[in-house]
Each structure stands twice: as structure tokens, then as C-alpha cells.
Amino acid sequence: MVSAVYHPLADGTVREFRDYVAPDKAVIERLFGEKLAPGIYEENREDVAQGITEEQLAHCWPALRQIIATIPTPAALDSAYATIGAVSRLSEIGIDEEKAPELLRYAPLVRHRLTLLRLLPCFVME
């Protein structure tokens, strides 16, 4: 799924960059519920992306685009998954495909990692 997000991003559709802003606690509670939200808060207590600025992103963007170019395309991944018999669609694991954008937006909160997925809200697309 992320390959299908990263490649169009790197293909020149970024119009501007924004400073990173951590997700609002109310949004986390709505998405993860009362039971899971405390663990998500703890996981993100020291947000790995905090302090990343639009200037830093703009400066690093050419290098990030080169890295993205090394990621297999969605078609290549689909072919590989089919070859090994792996699932490749949310619907194959019982999740509605329409939930993909929201899942991609909030998936980075589950683990304390700095990924491009966590920074997606910093990219303003054309």
C-alpha cells in the first residue's frame, strides 16, 4: 500500500512542504478508542518527527525522491505477492478498501518510528 502512496508523491506532485504537527489526542482517542489510546499516547510521547520543519523537508526532498525510486512499484509488488501466494489487498484480510487512506494516515502512530508515512501530512500535493 505505501508503495502506491510514495511513488506518486515522488513523481513531482508535491507543491509545498509544511512543518510536522503531531496528531491531536482527541483524534487518537476517536480512532483507537478508550482502551488502546493510552498505549498509543505512550508510544508517541516523544514523537520522533517533532521538530521537523518545512525547510528541512524541502532541503532533503531530492534525496528522499531518490530513495523512493528504489522502492518496488505497486505492480512489481503485486506480481511478487501473487508469485508467493501472499495477500495484497485489505479486503483479503476483511478490511474495507475505503478505509485505506485513514489507515495509512494513522498507521505510523502504532510504532515509534520515523517513516515517510508519518510525514505525509507535511506534503501539500497539487
List each language-model region with its residue ranges.
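Mg2+-dependent prenyl diphosphate-binding active-site environment of isoprenoid biosynthetic enzymes
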Residues: 1
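C-terminal charged capping/lid subdomain of soluble metabolic enzymes
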Residues: 5-126
